[in-house]
Structures are given as structure tokens and as C-alpha cells.
Amino acid sequence: MATNFTPISSSLYVGDLLPEVSEQHLFEIFNQVGLVSNIRVCRDTNTRRSLSYAYVNYYNGADAERALDTLNNTPIRGKACRIMWSQRDPSLRKSGVGNVFIKNLDKGIDHKALYDTFSAFGNILSCKVVTDDGNSSKGFGFVHYETQESADKAIAKVNGMMINGQKVFVGPFKSSKERGQPTEVKFTNVFFKNLSEDVGPDQLKELLQQYGEITNITIMADDKGKSKGFGFANFESAEAAKNVVENENGKIFHGKPIYAGRAQKKIEREAELKHTFETKYQGVNLYIKNIDDSIDNDKLREVFSQFGTITSAIVMKDDKATTSKGFGFVCYTAPDEATRAVTEMNGRMIGTKPLYVALAQRKDIRRAQLEMQHQQKFKTGIRQQMPPTYGSGPVFFTPAPVNPQVVYQQMMPRPRNWNGQPVGVPQGQYANMNYARGQPRQNGPRQNGGQPRQNGPRPDVSGAQPIPVQQQTTLDVAQTQQAASSAESALNLQSIINLPSRDQQNVALGEHLYPLIHNSQPDLAGKITGMLLDSLPVEELFTLTQRQDLLADKIREALEVLGSN
């Protein structure tokens, strides 16, 4: 299996990976061959799930070549991987030069056996046997040679040869465009609807028998034998069924225009209807939340009608259809109207609340976007501006520093070995705060101006008597509760908007959101608070401090994202 050419790079493509294979798994395997520079598992941009292939880069090209020789087809977590040289030029990959197609392969032929058979004719860049979801061979595969000469030699020698008792076909690879467009779907069963009540099997057969042999006709009826207005006709040939659909669909039959089309399974119909619906309303349907309780359907339509023609406007209500849920939808006839409405209305005060207006999205898309944001932060290490208590350890909520110029400490997404205590807490201010279960925090020696600091009473700077640890803790807690109470009474939307930066707005909102989230999710309050502060506008964050029901929904969404990771 050795390759005899010098690689042009030290980058390898590793394919056919299971979704759960991570960079760490690959590093443990490939670093045994030589020093690995970096590894990247390619992931979906929305869901961040693995696309089942990766790139492994070595510092040394010889190490990469050795890894290709020794690790190709090695099982990784139970499934054989496929390794080839990384080819960054897409024109070379898609040109078809040197690419060979093999079919009628025995089910026992895998990547390695195919490689061993065809490597005699030249240097192979990639080799693959196509498999199904159960990892069973589909009976065909591809071999990509370095040169077209090697490919021609393989075709001449192996085409028609018996391999494992089966005569294989070997020929030049052709793209789907070269092979021609896929043939249209053939069918023999035709679905009819909008039939008159007096139309029975005999009348329908009389209409359709001119097109060809009919094997079966059924008109659906209720318990009393009354026609439901639809039925099926099954033909002997697909050509006859096709002619019926082309000629009879929309024609008047017994006083009504009938529908004739290919009979579909329920799952096909639902997928088609869903696609039609999503295409029709894409870019024109708006999602509005934080709606004042006094706003009804008519008022919502009136407010948004200035931007274009509205086809529907609805405020969602509870099961009793009496109380507004605080959100709704407005649908326009054109995307530019919807875009203008989003630009003008998002954040505008209607009634007593600022509206949140955005293009409507499916729940799975919203969740994927939130998950992507969270994953990107975890991966790149972007820090969030958050109060120092956004961890899961402290029982008490820490007040803001006395000096208004002091910036709140930043915090990374929680790593595996994180112990749940505040990150970067200024020394001398919260050093003696009690933590969960009433246990005092144990401080080891820390460097402060080059001097180690021991746990104990604070130094007497002002000439006053040192305050014992226990007494100082009590004072800190009392100050915490007093500060939180004062901040809560002073919180209003305008004061937050007037703050000079988004970081300061996040701090003000975070001080109120954190204890509310901590009530239901004490272990994850820090993470969830950070996710909300980063992904939501100020107006909506303020609303969450006032509406427990909306906050509970957001907490639930965040838990779903965290749970999937």
C-alpha cells in the first residue's frame, strides 16, 4: 500500500468518520506517527455537528506520508477511516481526470481491498467503496489516480475481470451532469379529488379506459356509502397513468373540475406542503414579541399596516383564548415590506412595552443558531462581560464594586475542571465571602504586588481595628442584599438605555437576571445568564426581568442547547 511519490503538502483528508469522533480522538491516533500541527473536524455551520470528515496537518511532510501509508482504513471508534492527501484546488477534484468508477463489486470488498487491487496501476489519491447508513457496501466505488495514464491502465486491465466471483465494470468517472438528468418518477397509481357525489367506479372507469388497461379503481366512501369526493385508479403501465394526469387534471367532469395527480404517500405530501408553505412565506412573515396586553389583532394590524399590505395579523392567546401570550405574527405580501417593518418597529414603544420584531423562523432554526453562537464562544474563547458572581458556586449575589469605574470581571464559558467559583474576583473585596453549604472559601497564597497574601483579617489601612473574617462576611452579605434591593427598585428601561456602552447595560441587566435564573437553575445560572446577555437585545432582556413566563421559556431554550452539547 505504499505510495511512491512525494506529497506536495503535509495536510491529510480523513473521511468516513463517525459523528462523535472529535479532534482529541484523532490527535491520539495521528500523533503516534509524527508531530501533528493541528486537526480540524469540519462541522455544519448552523448545528455545529460533525460532517464526518476532518483535516490533519503535520509539521513534516514525511510524517504525513507515513500516516497515509500506515493509518489508512484504520478503525476509529469501530469504523474504518479513509485517508487521502488534502486537495485544496476544487477544479482538480471535480475535473474527473484520473477518476475511475467501479460497479458490481462483491459486498465483501471494502476500501482496503479495493485499494490493494488498483494500487498496482499507479499512485492513488483517494479510494472509496460507497456504503449505506448501516456501513454495508452498495456494490460500487471510486478510485482517483494521480494521473489519467494510470486510470486508463486500470480500466484496460480490470474492466470485465472477475473479483470475488463477480464480473466488475470499470470505466471513467462521469458527473451527474454528463450522465444526464435523472429520469422522471414513474408511477401507475393516480389520485383523483373534487369528484361529484354521483361519480362512482363505473363512471370513472368509463372516462379513463381510453388511456390504457386499468387494474383497479376505488372511490372512497363514508359509513353510509356516500362518496367522499376522492379516489384512486391504478393502471397497467406508467405511460397510461402519465397521460391521464396530463390530460384530465383540471377538466370538468360531472359539473366539477377534477384534480388528477400522482398518488403520494402521506410523508411525501406533508414534505411537499411544508416546503410550499415555507417558500411562500419566506421573508414576509414577522415574529413580534413583548406585545402589550392591551394589543389585539386589529390594533396589531393597524400599527404595522403603514409598511405595506398585510395578509394576516394575529396575537397569540392562551388555551381559553382570553389572555394574550405577549407575542404574535404579521405577514406581508412582499419581502421589502417586511424588512422595512423590522427596521422601523424593532424596539419601538407600543403601549407600555418596547416591541421585538424579527423575521419569523422555525423553532429548529432558532435553536440551531443559538447553539452555534454558544459553540463558537466555547471554541474561540470569546469572553463575556459579566458580574463576577455568574458562576454556580456562590449562594449570595455579590454587589457591584464601590468604584463605578471598575469593570466587571470577564468570564470564559465553563471549562470541565472549573470548580464553579467566581473568576478573577478582586482580592480584598470578596476574599472572605462564604460559599455554598456555609463553607468558607480556602485561599492559597496569591501574588499581589509581588507579596503573598494569606487568608485572614484584612490589613489595617485606615488605622481602624481589623474586622474579623466572620464579622466581615456578615457585613458583605448585608451590603449585598441592600445593594441588590436598591438596584431592583431603581431598574427601568430608560436608565439602562442611557448607559454609554452595551457592556455596562449587560452588567445592569445581569445583576437582575442572575438571581432570577438562580432560583430555578442554581448550577447553570452563570452560563444561562451569559448566553442571554449575548444573544438578546436590551429591550427584550429588560422584559425578561419583568416577565417570569418569558424568562422561563428562554431558560428552557438555553437548557436544550446546553443539553445537546
UniProtKB/Swiss-Prot annotation:
Care to name a GO molecular-function term for this sequence? mRNA 3'-UTR binding
Q: Name one GO cellular component term.
A: cytosol
Which PROSITE patterns does this entry report, sorted A to Z? PABC (PS51309), RRM (PS50102)
Give the RRM domain ranges. Answer: 10-88, 98-175, 188-265, 284-362
| A biological-process GO annotation | mRNA processing
Q: Where is this region: Disordered?
A: 435-466
Ranges of Polar residues compositional bias? 440-454
What Pfam families does the record point to?
MLLE, RRM_1
Q: Which CDD domains would you find in this protein's record?
A: RRM1_I_PABPs, RRM2_I_PABPs, RRM3_I_PABPs, RRM4_I_PABPs
Q: Mind telling me which SUPFAM superfamilies this protein's record contains?
A: PABC (PABP) domain, RNA-binding domain, RBD
The record places domain PABC at: 489-565
Q: Does the keyword Zinc-finger apply?
A: no
SMART domains membership: PolyA, RRM, RRM_1
Location in or out of the cell? Cytoplasm; Nucleus
Q: Which keywords label this protein?
A: Cytoplasm, mRNA processing, Nucleus, Repeat, RNA-binding
Q: What does this protein do?
A: Binds the poly(A) tail of mRNA. Appears to be an important mediator of the multiple roles of the poly(A) tail in mRNA biogenesis, stability and translation.
Q: Which PANTHER family match?
A: RNA BINDING PROTEIN (PTHR24012)
For this chain, the family text in UniProt reads: Belongs to the polyadenylate-binding protein type-1 family.
Q: What is this protein called?
A: Polyadenylate-binding protein 1-A
Q: Which organism is it from?
A: Dictyostelium discoideum (Social amoeba)
Q: What is the lineage of its organism?
A: Eukaryota, Amoebozoa, Evosea, Eumycetozoa, Dictyostelia
